[in-house]
C-alpha cells in the first residue's frame, strides 16, 4: 500500500470515528434527536471495517493512525465546532505527525 493510499485511508478512518462519536455527543449534550444514533452506529461500524484494510500489525496501525486522528480532530474543532486552535494545539499536531512518520517510515 502506498504512503498516499495509507494516509488517505487514515483520514477517512478518522472522519468515520469522529462522526461516530460526535453524533451521540449531539444527542446527549445538545438535544439532537435519538435518530442520530443510527448514522453514528453506521459510522463506527465503517470505522472498524476501515481499520481492517491496513496491511500491517494492528498495534502499529493504531499508533500511526493516532497522529492523523489528532490532526483531523483539531481540523474538526475548527471547522465544525468553530473554535480556532491555539498554537499549542498546532504544536501537538506537529509532534503527533512526527511520531506517526517515525512509526510509518522506520526501516523494518
Curated annotation (Swiss-Prot):
It holds the Pfam family UPF0060. GO terms for cellular component: plasma membrane. Its main location: membrane. Keywords: Cell inner membrane, Cell membrane, Membrane, Transmembrane, Transmembrane helix. Disulfide bonds: none annotated. The chain crosses the membrane at residues 3-23, 31-51, 63-83, 87-107. InterPro entries: UPF0060. It is found in: Cell inner membrane. It is a multi-pass membrane protein. NCBIfam families: PRK02237.1 (NF002586). Belongs to the UPF0060 family. This is UPF0060 membrane protein Sputw3181_1172. It comes from Shewanella sp. (strain W3-18-1).
Amino acid at each position: 500500500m502506498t504512503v498516499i493510499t495509507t494516509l488517505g485511508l487514515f483520514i477517512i478512518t478518522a472522519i468515520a470515528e469522529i462522526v461516530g462519536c460526535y453524533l451521540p455527543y449531539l444527542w446527549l449534550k445538545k438535544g439532537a434527536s435519538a435518530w442520530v444514533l443510527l448514522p453514528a452506529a453506521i459510522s463506527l461500524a465503517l470505522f472498524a471495517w476501515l481499520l481492517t484494510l491496513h496491511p500491517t500489525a494492528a498495534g502499529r496501525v493504531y499508533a500511526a493512525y493516532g497522529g492523523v486522528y489528532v490532526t483531523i480532530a483539531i481540523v474538526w474543532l475548527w471547522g465544525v465546532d468553530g473554535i480556532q486552535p491555539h498554537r499549542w494545539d498546532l504544536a501537538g499536531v506537529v509532534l503527533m505527525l512526527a511520531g506517526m512518520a517515525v512509526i510509518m517510515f522506520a526501516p523494518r
